[in-house]
């Protein structure tokens, strides 16, 4: 992505304007798979300027992001707690546990070793009945508009769908893992993947109780 455009997107107003037409689409699988109903404590990793916060106004919500301008903007617009933090080195309080962890369009900005470290830490923060919800940018294998836009994205690490699935399932027991196209006027502009997972130690117990 052009460096000037990337710098513009670091401004909260510009980022919110750019995301507005697609925010509802991106979060649709989260709603459809119980990510916003009945949850108590939410950790939104890479929360931006509060892009997802309104979905969790009824919860004990913590959003973290490395951009202080995003966090300042989010604090002025939403309830809940927002914290400036580098997600690749973020460490929660020892007793912090969340029944919903959301990672929305963050991991394609991060090299694989840091992604694995982050997901390993997030697994320890889930409650026994909690779930992680991940929405990520896919790099399609063939030339297409979604492949071009993935290449032009600010993130340097869009990955093929199979690679995302392998990364996610190596840390969490899959509950849902589906392709999720996002676009406009019936045209797919980005290929995304939606993943819902649980802590491996608790997945079998939860299935047995349902």
Predicted regions and their residues:
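A conserved beta-strand element that flanks and buttresses the S-adenosyl-L-methionine
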Residues: 102
């Amino acid at each position: 992505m052009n460096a000037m455009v990337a710098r513009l997107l670091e401004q909260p107003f510009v980022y919110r304007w750019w995301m507005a037409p697609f925010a509802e689409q991106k979060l649709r699988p989260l709603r459809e798979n119980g990510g916003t109903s009945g949850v108590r404590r939410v950790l939104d990793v890479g929360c931006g300027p509060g892009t997802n916060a309104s979905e969790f106004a009824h919860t004990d919500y913590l959003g973290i992001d490395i951009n202080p301008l995003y966090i300042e903007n989010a604090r002025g617009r939403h309830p809940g707690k927002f914290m400036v933090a580098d997600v690749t080195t973020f460490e929660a309080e020892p007793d912090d546990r969340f029944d919903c962890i959301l990672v929305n369009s963050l991991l394609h900005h991060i090299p694989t070793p840091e992604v694995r470290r982050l997901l390993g830490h997030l697994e320890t923060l889930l409650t026994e009945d909690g779930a992680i919800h991940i929405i990520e940018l896919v790099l399609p294998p063939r030339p297409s508009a979604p492949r071009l836009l993935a290449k032009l994205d600010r993130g340097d690490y869009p990955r093929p769908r199979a690679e995302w699935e392998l990364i996610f399932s190596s840390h969490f027991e899959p509950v849902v893992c589906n392709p999720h196209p996002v676009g406009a006027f019936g045209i797919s502009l980005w290929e995304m993947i939606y993943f819902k997972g649980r802590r491996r130690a608790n997945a079998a117990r939860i299935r047995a109780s349902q």
